[in-house]
Curated annotation (Swiss-Prot):
This is Glutamate--tRNA ligase. Zn(2+) binds at C98, C100, C125, H127. The lineage of its organism: Bacteria, Pseudomonadati, Pseudomonadota, Gammaproteobacteria, Enterobacterales. It comes from Klebsiella pneumoniae (strain 342). It holds the Pfam family Anticodon_2. One of its GO terms (biological process) is glutamyl-tRNA aminoacylation.
């Protein structure tokens, strides 16, 4: 039997981290078994589904590189199929037309609640022999079995049982002729030969209804696995107040897809004590039996740690392809400066996100209008004039422009003037970067370049001279 899973989001908003984790688990399970992964867009909610949301879901899946083997399928393009199946069920007696008015149903609901009963349809039209005109508005309901129970072996939670007496007759077609969500899902899973349905625990109550419909259609019943919810670090349901919840917001905030995937796979699943997983290792080790039943707590600090790890361990050339987008957002022209892969190596150790790198690198490519006020006040003082003049001349004299030779020039300046390295390095750092902090000074100066470094030192010397003039 070929394993076939699906990810079936409703396009009413962005792809959130909970949905992304479900997609990842479904994708990994299919890949682990050499199976296929289907993308299905469940857009039956015509009022809330939007093209923008569909695009956002696709963007998120593509950014995470969770490529699908089939699809995307759209439920709105399959309405004829759904209605044909409903018509067949009406003929077979496994579905029936319901003419009850909204007013009657509301009164029934209020009466049941007043009596402390669970609100449910009472089956009036199921047993009715009244004649109705062909054009009289009606819905179609599934004739749910009235005895026995539905038992399914959830691959994460174990056996789950529902009494059929607790399940009312589900509406499968509305008065406007459109099929309902729970019915469309059943026909889709049947037609697409889905063998394993991996989805959120909020779908557990839908499962017995869907199984009963599948059995009424003499269709195979897939295996089900329901993943627990994701909470914030305070134990409450994850929401925007806990930070970003959209997958693409994490892209915008400077996270690598490898970091988010690694974090999400561990958010409810484990393989021993291992924390870092390549994509290949995720595929090899993933199993539903190792997925926890308990809710997971989202910890942004842990995700940030993983992101920093991947920035510094993935090939710099690859990280640079993701950095490019952030550089463009900052409107930085990188033609006159270090290659982005070199920039990753320069700033990756200090910066934990790609956005931080992009916001920290402008001085490598563009001239800054002024020095950081605090750094200049502390380090661009008259006492720094001689160290800057000497190191400028030594840098200008370098023939083979390497970081090692830059380091020698800085060290030689300190030795010649018989001062500590800080007396040379700190004013030099402010001079060439405009700020008081940077990566190691030798590699920073090397990346900025000889002529640009010399020009900036001269600018710093002019700043010191002007400062002296104001003091006198």
């Amino acid at each position: 039997m070929k394993i076939k899973t699906r990810f079936a989001p409703s396009p009413t908003g962005y792809l959130h981290v909970g949905g992304a984790r479900t997609a990842l688990y479904s994708w990994l399970f299919a890949r682990n078994h050499g199976g296929e992964f289907v993308l299905r867009i469940e857009d039956t909610d015509l009022e809330r589904s939007t093209p923008e949301a569909i695009e956002a879901i696709m963007d998120g899946m593509n950014w995470l590189n969770l490529q699908w083997d089939e699809g995307p399928y759209y439920q709105t393009k399959r309405f004829d199929r759904y209605n044909n199946v409903i018509d067949e069920m009406l003929e077979a007696g496994t579905a029936y037309k319901c003419y009850c008015s909204k007013e009657r149903l509301e009164a029934l609901r209020e009466e049941q609640m007043a009596n402390g009963e669970k609100p449910r349809y009472d089956g009036r039209c199921r047993h009715s022999h009244e004649h109705h005109a062909d054009d009289e508005p009606c819905v179609v309901r599934f004739a749910n079995p009235q005895e026995g129970s539905v038992i399914f072996d959830d691959q994460i939670r174990g056996p789950i049982e529902f009494s059929n007496q607790e399940l009312d007759d589900l509406i499968i077609r509305r008065t406007d002729g459109s099929p309902t969500y729970n019915f469309c899902v059943v026909v889709d899973d049947w037609d697409m030969a889905i063998t394993h349905v991996i989805r959120g625990e909020d779908h557990i109550n839908n499962t017995p209804r869907q199984i009963n419909i599948l059995k009424a259609l003499n269709a195979p019943v897939p295996v089900y696995a329901h993943v627990s919810m994701i909470n914030g670090d305070d134990g409450k349901k994850l929401s925007k107040r806990h930070g970003a919840v959209s997958v693409m917001q994490y892209r915008d905030d400077g996270y690598l897809p490898e970091a988010l995937l690694n974090y999400l796979v561990r958010l409810g699943w484990s393989h021993g004590d291992q924390e870092i997983f390549t994509r290949e290792e995720m595929i090899e080790f993933f199993s539903l039996g190792a997925v926890s039943k308990s809710a997971s707590a989202f910890n942004t600090d842990k995700l940030l740690w993983l992101n920093h790890h991947y920035i510094n361990t993935l090939p710099a050339e690859y990280v640079a392809t993701h950095l490019q987008w952030h550089i463009e957002q900052e409107n930085i022209d990188t033609r006159n400066g270090p290659q982005l892969a070199e920039l990753v190596k320069l700033l990756g150790e200090r910066c934990k996100t790609l956005k931080e790198i992009a916001q920290s690198c402008r001085y490598f490519y563009e001239e800054f209008a002024e020095f950081d006020a605090d750094a200049a006040k502390k380090h661009l003082r008259p006492v720094a004039r001689q160290p800057l003049e000497v190191v400028r001349d030594k840098l200008a004299a370098i023939v083979d422009w390497t970081a090692e030779n830059v380091h020698h020039a800085i060290q030689a300046t300190a030795d010649e003037l018989e001062v500590g390295m800080g007396k040379v390095a700190m004013p030099l750092r402010v001079a060439v970067t405009g700020a008081g902090q940077s990566r190691a000074l030798d590699v920073t100066v090397h990346a900025i370049g000889k002529s640009r470094s010399v020009e900036r030192i001269n600018k710093a010397l002019a700043f010191i001279a002007e400062r002296e003039g104001q003091a006198s």
